[in-house]
């Protein structure tokens, strides 16, 4: 999944708004322990819910997480996954060293650590089977089981849900899960992910820290394509932000980190509490009211675009509460002289009213997005191809 120093935030780290970027408490990328989350001890909700209301929220969110897990288990048990090849599941772990003294797990040879977070670490390994590199997220099950992310939920639940979600998905703009290694005799748990060894197609036009329109358009097209696929499969990412977008050597963007994602049975994507990164949080999420997960993801796309174009956050306060207040109440400021089509797109994505906010379908067809490449077409995914093949067979 991970590439060395190729998160958007690191590319733009020369600009102050990214140098002090706040991490979601779940996010292992860019690998530092989190410093600014919903559980920071500050008031996280301008609506000011009382303790009874917070308890009700907790029960509701726990129920939502359990429903996500039940939906995912049902999909996996019945083969309802959008993957041509299933994720490999390995229940036997063998540790050792190669002839050069490098540590090994099964057929993977350790090369170097490429990151760490509050849950575990990410290490670059090379496979002796295909000689390819893989990014392996390593966890200790005992640590995850003790680590509370909510009064009734542990980090182990987050990781297992992330694994189940990634087992059901396959898309060129989404990081691919290759294998899960979970030996009951060991405390270790491994997620083997594709390694994105990319170089930035960085265009230094525009303000310091920004990417410029050409690169931003290219990247945003990939983000929208991947997110449209997720939403079509009833998956809400929940934490779209530059840190979770990785770029390949060919300039393709891949969405990663599904640790706070949720799955729905149908179009009912209503959520109550946002576990994502505060500065990317939609206004309705700040108010402690029920909101649409899809619409909140779309707002986060808007914040990401704003960052890519202008090199700063649209709303940022000195404290968590101040940030939420600005997201809810402050007007959106866009500098004069910006491309009118780009301005229109940013305003549509960052519309505070979720009912008036631009949809991803509208974004895919927006003039600034289409440019010379045309509208973003719907991806013909594995489950869609399979359904079409079955339909053709029934007609033949």
UniProtKB/Swiss-Prot annotation:
> Which compartment or compartments is the protein found in?
Cytoplasm; Nucleus
Q: What is its EC number?
A: 2.7.11.1
Q: In which tissues is it expressed?
A: Expressed in shoot apical meristem, leaf primordium and emerging petiole (at protein level).
What are the cysteine partners in each disulfide bond? none
Query: Which CDD domains does the UniProt entry name for this protein?
Result: STKc_LKB1_CaMKK
Q: Spell out the PROSITE patterns in the cross-references.
A: PROTEIN_KINASE_ATP (PS00107), PROTEIN_KINASE_DOM (PS50011), PROTEIN_KINASE_ST (PS00108)
Q: Where is this region: Disordered?
A: 22-65
| GO BP, one annotated term | response to virus
Reactions accelerated catalytically: L-seryl-[protein] + ATP = O-phospho-L-seryl-[protein] + ADP + H(+); L-threonyl-[protein] + ATP = O-phospho-L-threonyl-[protein] + ADP + H(+)
Catalytic residue list:
239
What switches on its expression?
Answer: By geminivirus (TGMV, CaLCuV or BCTV) infection (at the protein level).
| Family label | Belongs to the protein kinase superfamily. Ser/Thr protein kinase family.
Q: How does it assemble?
A: Associates with the SNF1-related protein kinase (SnRK) complex. Interacts with AL1, a geminivirus (TGMV) protein essential for viral replication.
Note from the entry: Functionally able to complement the yeast elm1 sak1 tos3 triple mutant.
In its UniProt entry, what is this protein called? Serine/threonine-protein kinase GRIK1
Per the record, the gene is GRIK1
